[in-house]
Regions:
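Conserved FAD-binding catalytic core of PHBH/FMO-like flavoproteins
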Residues: 72, 119-120, 166, 170-276
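A conserved short coil-to-beta-strand element within the FAD-binding core of flavoproteins
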Residues: 133-147
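Glycine-rich FAD pyrophosphate-binding loop
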Residues: 29-49
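Helical substrate-recognition/capping region of FAD-dependent monooxygenase/halogenase enzymes
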Residues: 2-11, 15, 30-31, 84-87, ...
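N-terminal Rossmann-fold NAD(P) dinucleotide-binding loop
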Residues: 21-22
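Core beta-strand elements of the Rossmann-like FAD/NAD(P) dinucleotide-binding domain
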Residues: 8-10, 156-166
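FAD/FMN-dependent oxidoreductases across multiple families
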Residues: 245-309, 329, 344, 348-351
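Active-site-adjacent segment of FAD-dependent monooxygenases/related oxidoreductases
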Residues: 49, 54-125
Length: 517
């Protein structure tokens, strides 16, 4: 170990150990990067906040080798519906089969339980991933070589310092990290206060497994089955109502009774109050310090994407940081983090606002009809934005992005076979690096000498995807057993695509397979 390496206590410090922080720590440790986490609280926040995850998030968990463990503590979600109190259904979103190698497409969660499972997985990395509980970060001092992190023990008041190369601030909506880098959080906070009521289920009732949005101007309600035998209602307080009006279970029960929920159905477990925020940080980076999750963006809950957006931030930043720290990528790669993640966070924020207008009956019938209208003439099969597979809007890609382009899309994940007859999900056979996939062609044959040298420098693999009715020809060939990959490439007229470690398509032969600038 060199003198320079000995000067660091860890490669990366993560401030905050909620879902975003633990996802960042897991992503880094999985890539062999040392992490120290500073978490102010000693215990997991006991109230459920996020209520759902989808197949994109589960694919991230798969990349970390923990998806099967997470699946054991979450439950499938049936569908989404928007209804009025007289029983009129305004809109429904069914969940079609996932293209990302996960079944089903959406899951209900109970956040404290899932969060504990994530922390248990992180705990298996030993000294590579060290967590300091009860440690409040009070100062960050960065220079050209790293960051000095000062934390205060909440119990003893003792100050400690750690020297790291980079810092990820994942310390939530009230982020101190954000303040330490003089970052503003622009946007709005709505005046309306909501009560969140978490209950233990005592018996099943009809259609409990729908995620139901009760649409009403005065009392719109989110009604959702959580995992582990829990159920939640989110209800706005009326003008003049305050927290003091709901200080006991006896005062809370009338809110549930109005929807026909009785003590035979559930037992009230806990309740809390909050307001909806629509805010985003003006920058997500200052030198060696990055923001992720709620520290960078806050959105209303209507799209179920707040926590998931943070987890996706963590993966995007984590795989890039790991490769920069290992010397495999230039530090300029870190500029792509915000360029790629900010548009996606803005998309889900806007979608949440739009869906909220339906729930609160602020959307006109014409607007609702437009939301339910399927556009014509698309190359990509239409799916409602809430459930459609993700697409990059920019960043480290080459070529046009849009309906008719494969660039920026997440490659589907069917079951494939290798030359030895092994069958597995695509990602499990591709590994975690850059890969060029050819449609029944060796992608190397489509590259110039300089292009191949550039991909070689990134450690890329070259894989031909063969039809299941043909022979494999090379040691790295894969067979499209589910007949998904080859038709997907053909839809966009692509003979070969370059796939990033996060499974987004960076380039295609149509616009050129050169490494994106």
């Amino acid at each position: 170990m060199t003198e320079s390496e000995q000067a660091y206590d860890a490669d990366v410090a993560v401030v905050g150990y909620g879902p975003t922080g633990v996802a960042a720590a897991l992503t880094l440790a999985h890539q062999g990067v040392s992490v120290v986490v500073f978490e102010r609280d000693r215990d997991i926040y006991p109230r459920a906040r996020a209520v759902t995850i989808n197949d994109w998030t589960m694919r991230i968990f798969q990349s970390l080798g923990i998806d099967e463990r997470v699946t054991r503590v979450i439950e499938p979600q049936r569908a989404l519906r928007w209804v009025t109190y007289d029983g009129t259904e305004l809109m429904r979103v069914e969940h079609p089969p996932s293209t990302l190698g996960v079944k089903p497409r959406f899951y209900n969660i109970y956040q404290p339980v899932m969060e504990q499972e994530l922390r248990d997985c992180a705990g298996e990395y030993g000294d590579l991933l060290r967590v300091e509980y009860g440690a409040d970060v009070v100062e960050l001092e960065q220079d050209d070589d790293g960051v000095s992190v000062t934390a205060v023990d909440e119990g003893t008041g003792e100050r400690t310092q750690a020297r790291v190369r980079y810092v990820i601030g994942a310390d939530g909506g009230s982020s101190r990290t954000r303040g330490m880098i003089d970052c503003d959080l622009a946007g709005d906070t709505l005046d309306v206060q909501w009560i969140v009521i978490d209950c233990k289920v005592k018996r099943w009732w009809p259609d409990r497994d729908f995620l139901t949005f009760w649409s009403d101007r005065e009392r719109p309600v989110v009604d959702i089955a959580l995992s582990a035998g829990n159920h939640r209602w989110e209800i706005p307080l009326k003008p003049g109502e305050t927290e003091d009006d709901f200080a006991s279970p006896a005062q809370v029960w009338p809110l549930l009774a109005a929807m026909g929920v009785t003590e035979d159905d559930v037992e009230i477990h806990q309740w809390a109050f909050y307001r909806h925020h629509t805010r985003m940080a003006d920058t997500w980076r200052d030198g060696r310090v990055f923001l992720a999750g709620d520290a960078a963006h806050l959105m209303p809950p209507w799209a179920g994407a707040g926590m998931q957006t943070g987890i996706r931030d963590a993966q995007n930043l984590g795989w890039k940081l790991a490769r920069v720290l290992r010397g495999e990528l230039d530090e300029a790669w870190l500029d792509t983090y915000e360029a790629e993640r900010r548009p996606n966070a803005a998309f889900y924020t806007g979608l949440a606002v739009q869906l909220g207008r339906v729930i609160k009956q602020e959307a006109s019938p014409e607007e609702i009809e437009a939301m339910n209208t399927v556009p014509e003439g698309l190359v990509t099969p239409f799916e409602p934005p809430l459930i459609a597979p993700p697409v990059l809007d920019g960043g480290w890609v080459r070529g046009p992005i849009g309906d008719a382009s494969v660039v920026g899309r997440m490659v589907p994940q069917p079951t494939v076979g290798d030359t030895t007859g092994r069958m597995a999900r695509l990602d499990d056979l591709l590994g975690d690096g850059f890969v060029l996939l050819g449609a029944d062609v060796d992608p190397v044959t489509l590259l110039t000498e300089d292009e191949k040298a550039a991909w070689d420098a990134l450690g890329a693999r070259y894989v031909a995807v063969r039809p299941k009715a043909s022979y494999t020809q090379g040691a790295d060939d894969l067979v499209d057993l589910d007949e998904v990959l080859l038709p997907w490439l053909a839809r966009y007229g692509a003979r070969a695509v370059a796939v990033r470690p996060d499974r987004f398509v960076a380039a295609a032969d149509i616009a050129g397979l050169a490494v994106p600038a």
